[in-house]
Swiss-Prot record:
<dbReference type="InterPro" id="IPR020083">
    <property type="entry name" value="Ribosomal_eL39_CS"/>
</dbReference>
<dbReference type="InterPro" id="IPR000077">
    <property type="entry name" value="Ribosomal_eL39"/>
</dbReference>
<dbReference type="InterPro" id="IPR023626">
    <property type="entry name" value="Ribosomal_eL39_dom_sf"/>
</dbReference>
<keyword id="KW-0687">Ribonucleoprotein</keyword>
<comment type="similarity">
    <text>Belongs to the eukaryotic ribosomal protein eL39 family.</text>
</comment>
<dbReference type="GO" id="GO:0022625">
    <property type="term" value="C:cytosolic large ribosomal subunit"/>
</dbReference>
<feature type="compositionally biased region" description="Basic residues">
    <location>
        <begin position="7"/>
        <end position="19"/>
    </location>
</feature>
<feature type="region of interest" description="Disordered">
    <location>
        <begin position="1"/>
        <end position="21"/>
    </location>
</feature>
<dbReference type="Pfam" id="PF00832">
    <property type="entry name" value="Ribosomal_L39"/>
</dbReference>
<dbReference type="GO" id="GO:0005829">
    <property type="term" value="C:cytosol"/>
</dbReference>
<protein>
    <recommendedName>
        <fullName>Large ribosomal subunit protein eL39y</fullName>
    </recommendedName>
</protein>
<dbReference type="GO" id="GO:0006412">
    <property type="term" value="P:translation"/>
</dbReference>
<dbReference type="GO" id="GO:0003735">
    <property type="term" value="F:structural constituent of ribosome"/>
</dbReference>
<keyword id="KW-0689">Ribosomal protein</keyword>
Length: 51
């Protein structure tokens, strides 16, 4: 990836970076909670973003 990114690409990368984190622990502690982990985690080497 070039070091000079367009602003739109940079914005998309930032969004994907924020999405790619584990769920907070307090969400796991809520009543009737069925979410155990973030099912949409993405590993930088296994799955590419495609842009």
């Amino acid at each position: 990836m070039p070091s000079h990114k367009s602003f739109m690409i940079k914005k998309k990368l930032g969004k994907k970076m924020r999405q790619n984190r584990p769920i907070p622990n307090w969400i796991r502690l809520r009543t009737d909670n069925k979410i155990r982990y973030n099912a949409k985690r993405r590993h930088w080497r296994r799955t590419k973003l495609g842009f």
